[in-house]
Amino acid sequence: MVRYVPRFADGQKVKLAWPLAVFRLNHIFWPLDPSTGKWGRYLDKVLAVAMSLVFMQHNDAELRYLRFEASNRNLDAFLTGMPTYLILVEAQFRSLHILLHFEKLQKFLEIFYANIYIDPRKEPEMFRKVDGKMIINRLVSAMYGAVISLYLIAPVFSIINQSKDFLYSMIFPFDSDPLYIFVPLLLTNVWVGIVIDTMMFGETNLLCELIVHLNGSYMLLKRDLQLAIEKILVARDRPHMAKQLKVLITKTLRKNVALNQFGQQLEAQYTVRVFIMFAFAAGLLCALSFKAYTNPMANYIYAIWFGAKTVELLSLGQIGSDLAFTTDSLSTMYYLTHWEQILQYSTNPSENLRLLKLINLAIEMNSKPFYVTGLKYFRVSLQAGLKILQASFSYFTFLTSMQRRQMSN
């Protein structure tokens, strides 16, 4: 059972950054390699079903805890279990969508790494520029790694202190104290934690990488067009200048259309999961900020988690805005092809007319910027990230006012 190995068009393996190398080991969110045999695929499905059942069990146990604390009107204890429950439900929705589109994801990634991913061997400068935009996301991945590490240390202290505490706030509908029941449940805690944590930083890293490399491909398209136009102007082959520019723009448009089509595939692949991610973000940030605010020393895990989620949203939003800016400038790119100079020097009136019609078509085709969206409701942009933070702050002030009211009573 081998997970999909990204490769360039020539078959060479792509060297993945460490967050994606870790994410590739996630048996729920990373597809299988096409070479995987029948029994390997069967085993993978069994693991996926087992993981889904464990998710459901954790959902039930954590929800029981939340209901118990809500009935006791214990806001602080209630919000202790809320972040892990929200991220668990989010993971359930996202994993379900992934499992229903597993084969499509593998084919999509195959297209990306073969055609869109910027090859550092051919374009080292552009690759460094694009890869530099991923540094913040890798820092976020390290912060998420710190969060799950702190959660996973808990079993060690549990053994030392001879207490039977689970990693998350849970109440089971049966007696979980016997060792033969407690240990398997604790191991499922660890399994869930690793799968969800790698999902949190891994899928966001993958989405950011898809967007920045698509953006970089558009930038290469613009650079290559400008360099080719300069050659036409320098050569000044007057009878053929208009035709040369027309052929160049036609070739560029074909690449442009291919990139646009990949953008639509990216939208189709991620629109549901982006919606789920953004829909849960405000509530999650609210709960995390409240716990970090009420007792920062005791709840440092929540503070780190809050910081990671905030930076993740802003970084993803900025990357989405960069792509929108680049695609919005494509119409200007075609307008600034020095067609006035070409027409001035050209001695072929019929080709001049065809050239003008083609430029008008190119401008019209690229009249709107491209955004990755969440079911057309959320846009992956910096503005959307700031709005989510604003909403979470509003919820946070509401919770703090509730806490003050409880304390006064």
Swiss-Prot record:
Topology feature Cytoplasmic, residues: 1-35, 86-139, 199-273, 324-379
TM region positions: 36-56, 65-85, 140-160, 178-198, 274-294, 303-323, 380-400
Gene Ontology cellular component list: dendrite membrane; plasma membrane
Keyword Nuclease part of the UniProt annotation: no
Keyword Calcium: no
InterPro entries referenced in this protein's UniProt entry, alphabetically: 7tm6_olfct_rcpt (IPR004117)
Tissue: Expressed in ac3B olfactory sensory neurons in the antenna.
Extracellular side, ranges: 57-64, 161-177, 295-302, 401-409
Function statement: Odorant receptor which mediates acceptance or avoidance behavior, depending on its substrates. The odorant receptor repertoire encodes a large collection of odor stimuli that vary widely in identity, intensity, and duration. Forms a complex with Orco to form odorant-sensing units, providing sensitive and prolonged odorant signaling and calcium permeability. Involved in the behavioral responses to esters. Involved in the behavioral responses to butanol, pentanol, hexanol, octanol, propyl acetate, and butyl acetate.
Other comments on record: The atypical heteromeric and topological design of the odorant receptors appears to be an insect-specific solution for odor recognition, making the OR/Orco complex an attractive target for the development of highly selective insect repellents to disrupt olfactory-mediated host-seeking behaviors of insect disease vectors. Odor-evoked OR currents are independent of known G-protein-coupled second messenger pathways.
Subunit structure: Interacts with Orco. Complexes exist early in the endomembrane system in olfactory sensory neurons (OSNs), coupling these complexes to the conserved ciliary trafficking pathway.
Family: Belongs to the insect chemoreceptor superfamily. Heteromeric odorant receptor channel (TC 1.A.69) family. Or1a subfamily.
Protein's name according to its UniProt entry: Odorant receptor 35a
Organism: Drosophila melanogaster
